Amino acid sequence: MTQALADMRRDYTRDGLSEAQAPDEPFALFHQWFADAVKTEQPPVEANAMTLATVDQDGRPHCRILLLKGLDAQGFTFFTNYQSAKGQQLAARPFAAMTFFWPTLERQVRIEGRVVKVTPEESDAYYQVRPLGSRLGAWASPQSQVIRDREELQDLLKATEQRFSDTQPDCPEHWGGYRLLPERIEFWQGRASRLHDRLNYRLQDSQWTRERLAP
């Protein structure tokens, strides 16, 4: 098994990333790369899937896959249960890192920064366009808590369906969005012989500085 893992590799030869291709600020490049991923990546890859890393109050890291649900000039938005493990971690230490990986394009984007809650109005607006099952699930699931078995979860959902049988569910107070306000964004383009292209943007005094990093 160890040798098999050691032999697993691929060479990246699809494209390069030069300073001439990169704008002065990172959002334009992210929009371009994300649009390329939407057009190019095929299921089961989801272009808006990302790894979100957080740190708990003891300094221990945690990561999981989430879906990006908003992007504007302020930052990158995702939604979750505020009482979940990640919600508690962000309450204790409001900083996070995101990583997008688009294997067909041989590209990766790393984003780091401070995290803030979005407004209740923004959370409600997104909540209302979710499928009904997802809206009910936000009420039914005590996310990250220990439950007895799958049947308990089904019972919680059934009770929630009965509760809202005559009305549409409102957005729960314990559920909503976070926005990561980027302070660093790195664009990685795979290249041959592991000599990858890495362009890094750092926010300093409200201005973005671009630099090339060694692979």
Curated annotation (Swiss-Prot):
Pfam families: PNP_phzG_C, PNPOx_N. It comes from the Bacteria. Substrate binds at residues 9-12, 69, 126, 130, 134, 194-196. It is an enzyme of class 1 (oxidoreductase). GO terms for molecular function: FMN binding; pyridoxamine phosphate oxidase activity. It catalyses: pyridoxamine 5'-phosphate + O2 + H2O = pyridoxal 5'-phosphate + H2O2 + NH4(+); pyridoxine 5'-phosphate + O2 = pyridoxal 5'-phosphate + H2O2. Binds 1 FMN per subunit. InterPro entries: Pyridox_Oxase (IPR000659), Pyridox_Oxase_CS (IPR019740), Pyridox_Oxase_N (IPR011576), Pyridoxamine_oxidase_dimer_C (IPR019576), Split_barrel_FMN-bd (IPR012349). Keywords: Flavoprotein, FMN, Oxidoreductase, Pyridoxine biosynthesis. FMN binds at residues 64-69, 79-80, 86, 108, 143-144, 188, 198. Its cofactor is FMN. Homodimer. Catalyzes the oxidation of either pyridoxine 5'-phosphate (PNP) or pyridoxamine 5'-phosphate (PMP) into pyridoxal 5'-phosphate (PLP). NCBIfam families: pdxH (TIGR00558), PRK05679.1 (NF004231). This is Pyridoxine/pyridoxamine 5'-phosphate oxidase. It comes from Pseudomonas fluorescens (strain SBW25).
